[in-house]
Amino acid sequence: MASSIVSSAAVATRSNVAQASMVAPFTGLKSAASFPVTKKNNNVDITSLASNGGRVRCMQVWPPINMKKYETLSYLPDLSDEQLLKEVEYLLKNGWVPCLEFETEHGFVYRENHKSPGYYDGRYWTMWKLPMFGCTDATQVLAEVQEAKKAYPQAWIRIIGFDNVRQVQCISFIAYKPEGY
C-alpha cells in the first residue's frame, strides 16, 4: 500500500510541471466581427479588373460537321506509321498490355438506345484476337494492325493500353480510319 501512495505522488508532481507549459484549451469561436467583410464599392473602375477578353477572339469551337472526334489525339491529323510506333512504344514502356479493337459501323460514340447517352452506345468495340500479354515489341502490334486492316478495310481500328494491375484502360487511340473519315 505504501508503494502505491509514493508512486501516485510522483505522478502528480510530474503532471503539475507539464501543465505549466501547456496551451490553453479551445474556448469556442469568436464573434463574426473580427472576420474581414467584403464591401460593395459602387465606384469600381472596370478597366482595372483582370480580363482575358483579348484572348477570347483566339478560341475556336471544334467544328462538328464532317469532323468527328474519336479517341485520344483525334484532334490531330492521322498518325503516320512512325508516330504509331512511338505511341505503342510509350504504351509498352509504361507496362500496359496492348489490345486492338475494331468497329465496322460507327467509329465514334453514338446514341442508339435512347436520346440521352447510354452506357453501351458506341463505347464497346469488337476485340481483335486476344490482348497481347507479354508483348515487348511495338512492331508486333503494328503488324496486327496491318492484319486487321486487311481483314476489315472499312473498319475503324484502335489500340488500347490496358493496365492489368489496376484493371483499367490507360490509353486509347485510333490507328486506322476507313477512307472518307
Swiss-Prot record:
InterPro entries: RuBisCO_ssu (IPR024681), RuBisCO_ssu_dom (IPR000894), RuBisCO_ssu_N (IPR024680), RuBisCO_ssu_sf (IPR036385)
Keyword check for Zinc-finger: no
Transmembrane portions of the chain: none
Cellular component annotations (GO), alphabetically ordered: chloroplast
Keywords per UniProt: Calvin cycle, Carbon dioxide fixation, Chloroplast, Photorespiration, Photosynthesis, Plastid, Transit peptide
Pfam families noted in UniProt: RbcS, RuBisCO_small
Keyword Endoplasmic reticulum recorded: no
Transit peptide: 1-57
Similarity annotation: Belongs to the RuBisCO small chain family.
Note: The basic functional RuBisCO is composed of a large chain homodimer in a 'head-to-tail' conformation. In form I RuBisCO this homodimer is arranged in a barrel-like tetramer with the small subunits forming a tetrameric 'cap' on each end of the 'barrel'.
Subunit structure: Heterohexadecamer of 8 large and 8 small subunits.
Protein name: Ribulose bisphosphate carboxylase small subunit, chloroplastic 6
UniProt source species: Solanum tuberosum
